[in-house]
Amino acid sequence: MPRRDDIRSILIIGSGPIVIGQAAEFDYSGTQACRALKEEGYRVILVNSNPATIMTDPEMADTTYIEPLRAETVAEVIRRERPDALLPTLGGQTALNLAVELSEAGVLEEYGVQLLGASIPSIQKAEDRQLFREAMERIGLRVPESRTVRSVPEAEELAERIGFPLIIRPSFTLGGTGGSVAEDLDALRASVRDGLDASPVRSVLVERSVAGWKEFELEVMRDLADNVVIVCSIENVDPMGVHTGDSITVAPAQTLSDRQYQSLRTAAIRIIREIGVSTGGSNIQFAVNPEGDDFYVIEMNPRVSRSSALASKATGFPIAKIAARLAVGYTLDEITNDITGATPASFEPALDYVVTKIPRFAFEKFPGTSARLTTRMHSVGEVMAIGRTFTESLLKAMASLEIETRDIQARLDEPSPYRIFAVFEALRAGMDIPEIYRRTSIDPFFIAAAARIVAAEGAVEETLSAEQVRELKRMGFTDEALAACSGYPAEVVRGVRRALGVHPTYKAVDTCAGEFPARTPYYYSTYEQEDEVERGENPSVVVLGSGPNRIGQGIEFDYACVHASYELKACGYDAVMINSNPETVSTDYDTSSRLYFEPLTAEHVLEVVRRERPEGVILQFGGQSPLKLARELERAGARVLGTSPEAIDLAEDRSRFGRLLRELGIPHPRFGTATTAAEAREVARRLGYPVVVRPSYVLGGRRMEIVYGDEDLELYLRSSVSGSPEHPILVDKFMEAYVEVDVDAVSDGEEVYIGGIMEHIEEAGVHSGDSSCVTPPITLTRSLQERIEDYTRRLALSIGVVGLMNVQYVVRGDEVMAIECNPRASRTVPYISKATGVPLARLATRVLLGEKLRDLGPRPASSGSFAVKAPVFPFDRFAEVDPLLGPEMRSTGEAMGIDPTFGGAFAKALAAAGQRLPESGRVYVSVADRDKRAAVLIARGFADLGFEVLASEGTAGVLRNNGLPAAVVPKIGEGGEDVLGLIERGGVDLIVNTPWGRGSRTDGYLIRRKALMHRVPCITTLAGAAAALQGIEARIRGETRRVHSLQDLYAART
């Protein structure tokens, strides 16, 4: 069928900020769709609130709105742009839910907007648990015994009939949000209440648990002519009961018989037809009885999903790109497979390799919370590896995780992060395969593979022969693993391996198991004879990606890597990407000239460098992971482009950096280092409390804390870290009541371009990644900004920075102090690039290639609007965690608000981050003693806006003494309706609560947790409360209803 000519413009809704369950895979999918539709000649309009995405780059769509993903905002975009169609299947659950909301509100009908990809009835049939169950029964497929309930008593009634355990699955949610396993009546009541709160339609499915059965997923595509293809089968190593996003998964499925696979395949085709997804992709999940052939249908996602991205990377079949073309009328047989250039998309991919995905977790950021894995997703990222066998891909994936395995404490009989390591330990201890299977329900096939690895470990000899090394490498053993088995250092093993002439070859991902030659250079390493790499005629430059997403190192760094790749190609170089993250745009097969899906270890990177012989290697865009390899690459003779490893060390070594600041006459907070607990106490007393304590060389504020006295310091030293000469404890004077400032800059070694100055909204003490910030600054005078720019230039030139750098300062009054310098891309690079219109990573890439800033002449758009970045947190996923901000980073993503006023931008950013400020109602204020005086102005501001002010007894007394009436709310547990009761019954609309005690049982902790559970905005800093006041004023004035495209903003401000 020809492409549709009755539509000219298409609106795409993105997925918003990175959250657990909805991450970088939707930037990858959305970017593919935007490009595909523009190539077809359609006008593409994009709405997304996440500035760290490639899809929100102004060239990806014709019109780009960085606005909150709320129905009223998207409706305003529709009113302004009048698109002919809406494609909602590429923005995750967020976009799907918005499409339903817009349809039910009559917006799509009012403006004549057609829905592409999936109809409203098909979305509802797939997402509403009861409708889905009825649909499956209609076509004769079994689902676990279940019932959709809308109240706790209904769930209790079902439990009496079918017993425990039960699975709770809310409707229209993502990543298992609100889902759980209930083992008894009390757990059921709590779980159903949580699930009803999580579901936008307040319904949950309560179903009989099939925990222990095997879980499989099929990625299915269908076109308007009713052609259906199965793109990929995926098997979960962990059994049912663990969310698929938290399970190790393998593609293609390894333990299905042909009969079982054909049964699932037939069922999947019947399901996609029954649900009515007429064009595009869907993910369908099954539970298969490990003792037979019977199976249940678990659920279906009628859209591109997290597994779709994995399947695309595993097979080379670009699901999102093809889904976009199917949505505008093409059929599968009319679309050419980009990988081969010779086969149509109606050919199902065939794999002659095995792909393994392992999730990456961040439980260490949330101490005190249970690490037991359930149906609610907890992982923050993932790695993928490709090998010729399952063992090879598993060991490569384990090497890609970038975790300290000695810190892992996993139990065999409890689903937990990295349980695979417990399986290995059990095998090493002599436990047999049947016993491990009994304890884990992991299929014996996978346990046997682990047993072969353990047996090979034991057979490693002190003298390694070429054949033995080659065989072990074929199994997937890294040089580090061989070193651990043989007792030699990894460098020695590497030297022996090279002396024996044992090197990897590289195979292409071609979608057809070698039947047709691959045109797109997408490679993985293995130890076989034939090498399939075809180098181009252009000189090449290697870009190291950032590896798995994690808190502190997320999509922002992938954004910089993608920009580097684009710019290298624009400058006539072959861009060679090395990365292990299947979610991201950087691992799309056509982002770079050649893609190597490999772990970011010295061994794997050096082998690619050996094969490619590049002009240089770029490390500075991928965060801390690539920087750790700088010295080893330099020793191996690789040319590191940009800032030298020596300069990197100068900036990151606290003592050396402190000496440099003193030489330059740049003020800085007093600090000290300690190698023992006693030294830490001595340094803290010398500096004077409060102090900030942390280990050296950390990312994302890991194990960083503000301590206010000896007792706090003792608790920190006992629970968190102990110093040593190799890893000293850093102790800094904490700068109370200072404002933190971030600066992103590019240096060519002679000149420095200041990309932007960002003022944090929270005071110093909150990690920069967790603080909201605004550019241009709102309280810094021009003279202060000039001094900050001067300090930044002097630091860049003195350190020897070539490329990107980020400097952090604290400011109070007329005082400016430097606190940190990172000679690499920062997490604010995408945000400041979107705010100013200057793509800093592209500019830095040109500098790395030897060009000069004076010739490039970057020109930011003159300031006409404020841009606010607001963080997004996963606190709802981690029970018992205090949602209090501090020096350790815990946010997973960010949203951005743009408006001519600061208040409007801040309100938009908060709304986009999931915190909608109320325009009226009741505000509860309860602050620490040190904040009570300043809280008077805040409370008066709310009263002036018409809010009723409620307060704790102590805070109310101060407010009344200053002439401000405030109703006293009783202390928790002392009779009468306390604030917890008020929150539960919806009697408070906004909370301002600053901490006043250490530990998890203070009243403040209980208030913050209860507010989180009931989605009441809770602000934990007075600076944040002051900004919220301005945001509420902007909402009342109607300023947040206006929308602005990036293209219009840039055109108006140049």
UniProtKB/Swiss-Prot annotation:
Mn(2+) 2 binds at E299, N301. Composed of two chains; the small (or glutamine) chain promotes the hydrolysis of glutamine to ammonia, which is used by the large (or ammonia) chain to synthesize carbamoyl phosphate. Tetramer of heterodimers (alpha,beta)4. Binds 4 Mg(2+) or Mn(2+) ions per subunit. Residues 1-402 are annotated as: Carboxyphosphate synthetic domain. Mn(2+) 1 binds at Q285, E299. It comes from Rubrobacter xylanophilus (strain DSM 9941 / JCM 11954 / NBRC 16129 / PRD-1). This is Carbamoyl phosphate synthase large chain. The gene is carB. Mg(2+) 1 binds at Q285, E299. Residues 532-914 are annotated as: Carbamoyl phosphate synthetic domain. InterPro entries: ATP-grasp (IPR011761), ATP_grasp_subdomain_1 (IPR013815), CarbamoylP_synth_lsu (IPR006275), CarbamoylP_synth_lsu_oligo (IPR005480), CarbamoylP_synth_lsu_oligo_sf (IPR036897), CbamoylP_synth_lsu-like_ATP-bd (IPR005479), CbamoylP_synth_lsu_CPSase_dom (IPR005483), MGS-like_dom (IPR011607).
